[in-house]
Amino acid sequence: MSEKGGKGLKSSLKSKDGGKDGSSTKLKKGRKIHFDQRTPPANYKILNVSSDQQPFQSSAAKCGKSDKPTKSSKNSLHSFELKDLPENAECMMDCEAFQILDGIKGQLVGLSEDPSIKIPVSYDRALAYVESCVHYTNPQSVRKVLEPLKTYGISDGEMCVIANASSESVDEVLAFIPSLKTKKEVINQPLQDALEELSKLKKSE
């Protein structure tokens, strides 16, 4: 449109600073902005959806099956059931377990020649575990120190925890065995004496 015929009509696009016609593709310093007018990637498409839906949807999301477990994954899950120990079961300290497993180690050659005896795969792992956390080399001495605690209501299982934890104070023992907190006034001194004796065993060994 010529200047004469278009005096009454002004461009609806004006810049804020000068009132002159502005362009959406220019900045104040004259730098041009290039708009990418290419179409979106093939695996995404723009949807006219409601506000509670996502504006973009990938081709992978259409199927809606990626978040569901497959049959193979279900089969790989194992269920474990806690069972009570047999009545004749006895708790064992780490040092006692190590003594037994280490004794078997010296007989492995002869045992492997007997077809009726099969050493479980877990043997090596069990031996390595108890060997790494054992604190005493003489289980009989440890039992002798802890046995008197039974008169104060401490069970075999709790005795094993005391030995395995190698605690240095009564408070540490109570942290490992909260059930003993109700007996603290009764067992405090006997337990402290036992811990001191266990400490001597560790130093002497």
Swiss-Prot record:
Residue ranges with Polar residues bias: 48-60
Keyword Nucleus on entry: yes
Principal place of residence: nucleus
Top-level lineage group: Eukaryota
Cited Pfam families: RNA_pol_Rpb4 (PF03874)
A GO BP entry: regulatory ncRNA-mediated post-transcriptional gene silencing
Distribution of this protein across tissues and organs: Expressed in shoot meristematic region and in root tips. Detected in cotyledons, flowers and young leaves.
Purpose of the protein: DNA-dependent RNA polymerase catalyzes the transcription of DNA into RNA using the four ribonucleoside triphosphates as substrates. Component of RNA polymerases IV and V which mediate short-interfering RNAs (siRNA) accumulation and subsequent RNA-directed DNA methylation-dependent (RdDM) transcriptional gene silencing (TGS) of endogenous repeated sequences, including transposable elements. Required for the de novo DNA methylation directed by the RdDM pathway.
Protein name (record): DNA-directed RNA polymerases IV and V subunit 4
The species this protein was found in: Arabidopsis thaliana (Mouse-ear cress)
Species lineage: Eukaryota, Viridiplantae, Streptophyta, Embryophyta, Tracheophyta
